[in-house]
Amino acid sequence: MLRSRQATNALRAVGQTRPLRSQTAVAFTQSLNKVPSNRRSEATVATASSTASGAFNSQVRPTPSPTFNQYDSKVQPLTGMSRNVTDESFIGKTGGEIFHDMMLRQGVKHIFGYPGGAILPVFDAIYNSTHFDFILPRHEQGAGHMAEGYARASGKPGVVLVTSGPGATNIVTPMQDALLDGTPMVVFCGQVPTTSIGSDAFQEADIVGISRPCTKWNVMVKNIAELPRRINEAFQIATTGRPGPVLVDLPKDVTAGILRRAIPTDAAIPSLPSASIQDAMDLNHKQLEASIARVAKLVNMAKQPVIYAGQGVIQSESGPELLKKLSDLASIPVTTTLQGLGGFDELDYKSLHMLGMHGSAYANMAMQEADLIIALGGRFDDRVTLNVSKFAPGARAAAAENRGGIVQFEIMPKNINKVVEATEAIVGDVGANLRLLLPHVESRSTDDRSAWYTKIDAWKKKWPLSDYQKTERHGLIKPQTLIEELSNLCADRKEKTYITTGVGQHQMWTAQHFRWRHPRTMITSGGLGTMGYGLPAAIGAKVAQPDALVVDIDGDASFNMTLTELSTAAQFNIGVKVIVLNNEEQGMVTQWQNLFYEDRYAHTHQANPDFIKIADAMGIQGQRVADPTKIKESLQWLIDTDGPALLEVITDKKVPVLPMVPGGCGLHEFIVFNPEDEKTRRGLMRERTCGLHG
């Protein structure tokens, strides 16, 4: 039977979610043409399924379908099982009132957003609701980043509610940020009435088209009867597989209209069961078991293994706990990505801290010399691999000799072999697959790997992260020193301390010099690198964790982009603590201009406002510190102050973030701090800028 790829994908998705119903349907399904599968490279890919426990029940299926975790813009998501049960509870309610009730059913406690004409029916319905809190930012971008911070700190999806046109387009940056960083977020935006769509009506924007590349899924609700189903789908898709943002477009006539009839409790979609599905699931499980066995063999054989842990570990249930079990059992050192910080206790002897462009030198060396790299929930981002042709030569050589290689545990099939070719690939939830792997891993002590740890210890001694210019020039504060002091002050409360950052040098210094011990405590923009992320994300994190200490460590340039959200913190008494490292420049860009553009500082210096006066004008307490001897005292004031507070720190200028791997280089070709090199660098800077800088 001939059919389109769209129909094929839909039938396969439905088949995966339906129990066997009739022999007629089975025979019909078996007559369908088989869809050719894409061939991958030498990596063996096995899909983790609900059979992780070793048993398969044909009457139980994962919800939503595994197809939801695969991106196909031509296939609408299929959720729920078709039933004849209807729900009469929404009859007589407006679309806005249905929205309110659906938020309650989804367990939503907080919403971030900004009102406008096209979304007023919803705002009217939630007016004075006692069931959840509404946080009103000063800009829709702030609402999006607040929702991201909320989601990152809580593990629950952040919810955004904005109007049409500019209200919707202002949320695009947070959605793209959430997509790249795997943050669950559900965005509801108003839209002009369906009768006006396409007429260039006031504040009309094709937000479904605009947001298609920056969401996991989006939809316009075209009639009130489908509103509950679409809301359910949105929350399911945002939180399953690799989390991400979804968008639901709500025309005004839908939210203002009244439902006149009962609606199905779930999506009423046709069912087409397939007898081949159980066979396929059994085959996948057998392939998974075989792949796990091969991975265990590589782990047991490896002499110099290293675990590279990404955010997938943190997002997986019990991921950090299982990571620790694997590391302890086989005595394998662990390095983490920027977004994986906190997934492994950095006070553990086996910790290598962060890897990558600004990672520790010893983590980068371990990645280059390891004979086996176990990648857990990491996608081999370019800031991790740098020059791919020079990446992991030790593991590649071991793979060629069948004694090691690169093992990738990844939830998204499309990320397998996307950047780096994997020797073995395990597709599925990291935690579920680690549970399958652990029983097959042989115990090893650090003494059994003494040669490997001797190398690592030598690298740690030669290139410690604490190696930077601590002598303050002209009595100026070093940012690294301040962050280390903050880490020390929070040493006994790390589990309840959440740090957010903007993007720039301060972000990397925070990653390097704060000691991370618990998951979800580092909240930053990694994939998109969104300046201005820190303050609104901190507000969202504090809303999610009201009893925790939430500190935004920001740079002056990044802070300038969203500082108006201080007013939000003041209005709602959200007790975030803000540290602004003020060097009056766009530090990360000036670092590149210094190293690679002969100190031509093109438009990277700005005149800042008086941050303390701004804080005072917005009703927030503020202090400024410029004396290195007052760092501890000032930080203690910030921590102890009730409500939101701001500490401006006047820091040294032109301080580089080191270690650093220049673009185009291998991980082992890093620049580290050297006192003589620092003197030469500053002297050359003064010469090139006629004494203006340096």
Swiss-Prot record:
Pathway(s) served = Amino-acid biosynthesis; L-isoleucine biosynthesis; L-isoleucine from 2-oxobutanoate: step 1/4; Amino-acid biosynthesis; L-valine biosynthesis; L-valine from pyruvate: step 1/4
Q: Name one Pfam family in it.
A: TPP_enzyme_C
**Stretches for region Thiamine pyrophosphate binding:** 505-585
Which positions are annotated as binding thiamine diphosphate? E140
Top-rank EC class of the record's enzyme: transferase
Q: Where is the composition biased (Polar residues)?
A: 59-69
What molecular function terms (GO) are annotated for this protein?
A: acetolactate synthase activity; flavin adenine dinucleotide binding; magnesium ion binding; pyruvate decarboxylase activity; thiamine pyrophosphate binding
EC numbers listed for it are 2.2.1.6
FT transit peptide: 1-42
Which is a GO BP term held by this UniProt record? Answer: L-valine biosynthetic process
User: Which InterPro entries would you find in this protein's record?
Assistant: Acetolactate_synth_lsu, AHAS_TPP, DHS-like_NAD/FAD-binding_dom, THDP-binding, Thiamin_PyroP_enz_cen_dom, Thiamin_PyroP_enz_TPP-bd_dom, TPP-bd_CS, TPP_enz
- NCBIfam families reported in the protein's UniProt record: acolac_lg
- Quaternary state and interactors: Homodimer.
Q: What is this protein called?
A: Acetolactate synthase catalytic subunit, mitochondrial
The taxonomy runs:
Eukaryota, Fungi, Dikarya, Ascomycota, Pezizomycotina
Name the gene: cfoL
